[in-house]
Amino acid sequence: MDQHHGARGGAPIRRPRRSIESRSHPFRATGNTQRTYSTPRLSYRDGLSGRTASRDPQEQASNQDESSNPSTSNAQQSTSFWGYLRRVFSDDVPAQPQAPRPRADFAPPAGEESSSEEEEEEGPAQAPLDEEDQLMYADQYSVGDSSDENDEEEDPRLGSDYPTSAESSEYHDHGEMVAGAGAESESETDIDAEEEEEDDEDDEDDMEVIRDESYRLPRTWLDKSIRLMDEALAQSSELSKAITKSTRSLYDSQFAPGGRGYTQTATPSRRLVQLSRAGMYDSDKIVMTGDYMEVDDDPDSAYQSWVRAIRHPLAMNPSWEETISNHTNPSFSTDIDYDIDELIEKNLARTPPVFEGLLDSAEFFYKLPMLYTYATITQDEAYEERLAWSNTQALHGHEQSSWQALLVYYSRGGMYVSPTQEPRGIWRRALKQAMALQLKMCVLGLSDVVTKQNATHHHAAVTFLVDALLRTARNCYLASRLLVFAWERRRETGAKRPAEPLIALSGVTLLQPLPPEVSELLEQRTFDIGLRTPNSAVFRAFFGSLVYWAELRLALRDPASINCRYVGFHLQTSEIYLLARAHSASPGYTKEELVAMEAILTLATLMLEVALQWVHVACAQLLSENDTIKAFRRVSASIPHALAPLGSIRLHDAEFEVLSNPDVMVARDETALSQALFLGYFSVRTALTACMRDYSHEADGGSKETVTGVFLGVGLILQRLAGHLNFLLNCLAGAALYGGQKINIHSLTLPRYSLLADVMAPMLQRQSLVDFWRARDNMLEDLEITPRPGPPTQGKRVVVEMPLPSDDLPDMTPGASVNNGAGLGRMVDMAKQLQHYRETIIGEEATSSVGKRGLIRAGVGVAALRGRRRK
């Protein structure tokens, strides 16, 4: 044979491509030698998981070694004519076609299962398969049926500390296969495998999985041992896995709010101390002039101009009106019988800690007659209240629970949060998983303390609520004065210049100071951070979870009780949709969803400021010797709350400015998440306005017990609203910093949120961005749910879709503005602005790499991605 051609025998020399078997049968079962040349390669959009293509890593490695060894005739496996003749006349056995390595980021996690509903309902209809297609789909799908048909049905209890099954190591095996690819021989076929691996790496770059070094907080040396135990799960027996996970759950519980290892700072942070010292000096005083101390016989007389400016009454949410009409068993404070002597014996009739030494018990409960809230709530009453919550109609049509004791059915395994093809649709599998995750994040911590320890009564929550609400009012007193002096010193330089967020807000703030004569009990010079006890740590945590406690809602009595339930349910729905649309493997949202999230964050933050000013004035009125003076006109008049949301012209104009934006109007109607967020916002707006109306009606010669109950109900709603804003902000900031998405936000939203979070510190422990995503992944792991990119696989593609946009939303938008400008600021890049709030929003423990992707994107105007996914 010609020496120039050697073993090739004169055949043309060319670089061989991947075999036709691999290209046309990427998912064919191992060992199938039948050739099929007409079947095209399917993309990831067809929902193939590649499970049958994966084999044991050791077996694959051995096969690769055998295929890379030269044959006995020293002839290469060529696809040319000469190569075909050589194989016919040689003694070599043809090598079996090898399936390509499965993509590690697309294969479903081990143990993935479907819920019973997913097994009953099929996904999108599939075209009939011919004989060739059936061969290609061998062992991958059953023709005309779901691949999840034989999965076992699991009904996990959400609060289980000892899981019955452990995670499989299939995902880790994929990682070993990837690592092993670099050790293969440098043959031509191996070069093709490396090219395919590079393509897979480019695909994986499209989704940024959060792997920041600050993702787990260092606690003690024991924490490292727990992490090592986690890493050893894949190589352990089933019993060892269960013991390891139980040990970690027990360890983490010690550092949960209220646990023995949970640390609470006893004094305000250095940032808060510096904020108050730099903004107000000991010699600073506010002198107010006017007739504010005169008796006001007709509070509405000052608001007649509103009637001419706003011609239409405020629209209330139709679902709220339906809820009120269906509330057939109201319970009012005047109907409650309680024994004062018994309450004194139980040491319940005592002054809250915030006013110890300032007011005795008799004087305090005369000003705030709230002893009826300590009356016993029976188990039957609590059950009926929880049942009323569950029976409320949700947007997605599934039952929502307000307590851990009720079962939540969901599918373990992969969680897929990609957008659906249907408008206003969402994957039902992800929705059910999000319902379980929301309960674990926002309810389980409180319900564990209440039910498992069986040591906490709703009395403790009532005491915490009134104490925290009074401390919050005192923080409003301080913040309002800091803003006044920030405006006065806005042109100062050096050490005398106030903090920049205070200067930015000082000209547009709604926190207005009260006259010193009516706010003596609220006066303070530093921010109050609230009680520091185990119970208070639990009540302050979990994004404002007290509203989920049925006994506490009932204790406040109507009208506060029904409004708290209404708000809690619809905000829970909003958070379920937020969790069902993003996770750490896919932290981004669609453009329309981001527009809606920013609009709700801006409006709800302004609404929180309006409500806190109302709390400030109402608290001063309840504690005042004379509650009919003009200084309290803001909460005594009824006309403002009949014409404007929460009785605020500023909020009215802000809603018109934001909701009339064409982009916001499109976003509101196009996605399910946007629908849930807007209905949640309008639910809070309606309930708070209704409570303020009831307060103004009862304050004029009505029941003082009802006035106190409404005041506490507003506080309970505000705790839940502030927690929801914390939740929403962390999701939006994660999309900007971890997902690298371009998000424009009003420039005054983050300064306003940061200040209000400091004001509400006695009521709510805010969670930083890093803590939020870390805790979220840990809880998903506890639920045996694995975040996965891309759409769900075949059989799990059931979509829950809203048929039409809600008719309620357009009617809730104001028809015109009253004044020019709502004080929201200009639009700025969120990723850049967040860098000024690393301590308050991102988290003190965050490294400098947090937000790097968002900043790179912000600098060039597009997402910093190395490659694009193949379609």
UniProtKB/Swiss-Prot annotation:
Which N-terminal stretch is annotated as signal sequence? none
Stretches with biased composition (Acidic residues): 114-134, 146-155, 185-207
Which GO CC terms are listed, alphabetically? Answer: host cell cytoplasm; host cell nucleus; viral tegument
Describe PTMs of this protein.
Phosphorylated by US3. This phosphorylation is required for proper nuclear localization.
InterPro entries from the xrefs?
Herpes_UL47
Q: Where in the cell is it found?
A: Virion tegument; Host nucleus; Host cytoplasm
What UniProt keywords are attached to this protein's entry? Host cytoplasm, Host nucleus, Late protein, Transcription, Transcription regulation, Virion, Virion tegument
Motif Nuclear localization signal: where in chain: 13-33
Q: Compositionally biased, Polar residues: which spans?
A: 30-41, 59-81
The principal location of this protein is: virion
Q: Does the keyword Transcription apply?
A: yes
* Chain spans, region Disordered: 1-212
Single biological process term from Gene Ontology: regulation of DNA-templated transcription
Its family remark reads: Belongs to the alphaherpesvirinae HHV-1 UL47 family.
**Anything else of interest in the record?**
Expressed in late in the infection.
Q: What does this protein do?
A: Tegument protein that can bind to various RNA transcripts. Plays a role in the attenuation of selective viral and cellular mRNA degradation by modulating the activity of host shutoff RNase UL41/VHS. Also plays a role in the primary envelopment of virions in the perinuclear space, probably by interacting with two nuclear egress proteins UL31 and UL34.
Entry remark concerning the domains of this protein: The nuclear export signal is CRM1-dependent.
Q: How does it assemble?
A: Interacts with US3 kinase. Interacts with UL31 and UL34; these interactions seem important for efficient virion nuclear egress. Interacts with UL41/VHS.
Please state what the protein is called: Tegument protein UL47 homolog
